[in-house]
Amino acid sequence: MARKLTEKVSWIGKIDWELKRFHGDEYSTHRGSTYNAYLIRDKKTVLVDTVWLPFDHEFVNNLKREIDLKEIDAIVMQHNEVDHSGALPALMQEIPDTPIYCTANGVKILKGHYHQDWNFVPVKTGDTLDLGESKLTFIEAPMLH
């Protein structure tokens, strides 16, 4: 279920109350964690990130309750590890031609995880995506979690 954050932005992620350890034993998440994904609605509609693979179908079904998937003009993948990109294969089965904006390294990571040659649009720092009344400006930030 989406949570409206602003007039144009909704959180469409997943709360995982069962996650107790993150990245092995490195971090304790004894209160669970979230997989954050956002839906931005302007003249163009953009999905930012997805959720972890075990929640892929739940994520896609929740997204379908919020929007006709064909109305998604673009997907922005800013974090490409499977805890944020895991639902991408299930989503791309529904909307296979939707452009995926991410860095060149992001393209390599996503291809490495999922072995798919989706409609990738590589971006670099300073590139923008015009949404209508607003725009996204890309910043390469490797290793940022």
Q: Where does each model-flagged region fall?
A:
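Active-site metal-binding motif and surrounding structural segment of the metallo-beta-lactamase
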Residues: P54-I100
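Metallo-beta-lactamase
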Residues: R3-E7, C102-H145
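Generic structural signal for beta-strand residues in well-ordered domains
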Residues: A2-R3, H30, Q93, L129
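Active-site environment of divalent metal-dependent phosphoester hydrolases
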Residues: L19, N80-S85, V107-L110, H145
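Conserved beta-strand hairpin/beta-sheet module of binuclear metal-dependent hydrolase folds
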Residues: R3-R65
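Short catalytic-loop micro-motif centered on adjacent basic/acidic residues
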Residues: V46-D49, A74-M77, T137-F138
